[in-house]
Amino acid sequence: MNEDYFLRLARRLRIPVARAELIHDREGRAGLVVQRFAGVLVDGEVRALAVEDARQLLGRYPADQYSLTSEQVSTAAATSCPARAVAARACLAQFVFAWLTGNGDMHAKNLSALQEADGEWRIVSAYDLPSTLPYGDRSMALSLDGRRQALTRKAFRSFGTGLGLPQRAVERTLDDVLRATDPLLDDLRGGALPLNRNATQDLVRQLARRRQDLEE
């Protein structure tokens, strides 16, 4: 499945990623089971943890989840966490990963902060990571550096420093995500996604261009 592959790929990043397992029913139909992250086991009982997505942190309506910017949602999520630099890096890494994998559905409800049992807030493990590019979705869900397409290393550099990260940390994060996604193109050529030959070639071509733009 699409999302199962990209969740596994995302585990190469140096950020938390949602735990998931691909299962099949008796008819062989596949389904993805994702572990809940909004609860913790205490004395044998599950205690709910507070979770707020970026839209909620900004006090916006549900309909606004696509009308905000990457800068707005990342700033809201990162500033809710005491370890702001760690949170900002996680936000940057998630948006870079989304661009390099063709995930055009990284909207304001897909970036959240969670309050741990000890009361500290942190960025929630990355989740909802499908590639939507094979289905004609060629843009980011939210604008970044003023645009949704043709994103470059310069655009992500501006985005990261705007979140308060030192330029060296931004460059390191960009390189980390590029390394983490290095197997992607070969995996796609090898049939990692259930696409026909033409769709696979088109996806590889577009993602290769995105990588080139971030490597420059």
Task: Say what each PLM segment does.
Residues 16, 83, 164-167, 194:
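Short coil/loop linkers at secondary-structure junctions
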Residues 53-76, 113-171:
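Catalytic-core segments of enzymes that bind and process phosphorylated/nucleotide-bearing substrates
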Residues 1-65:
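Conserved ATP-binding subdomain of kinase catalytic cores across diverse folds
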Residues 31-36, 182-188:
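A short beta-strand motif that forms the metal-chelation/ATP-contact edge
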Residues 1-13, 69-135:
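Conserved kinase catalytic-core segment
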Residues 67-71, 88-92, 172-173, 189-190, ...:
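Short coil/turn segments at secondary-structure boundaries
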Residues 79, 120-123, 162, 188-216:
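Regulatory N- and C-terminal appendages and interdomain linkers associated
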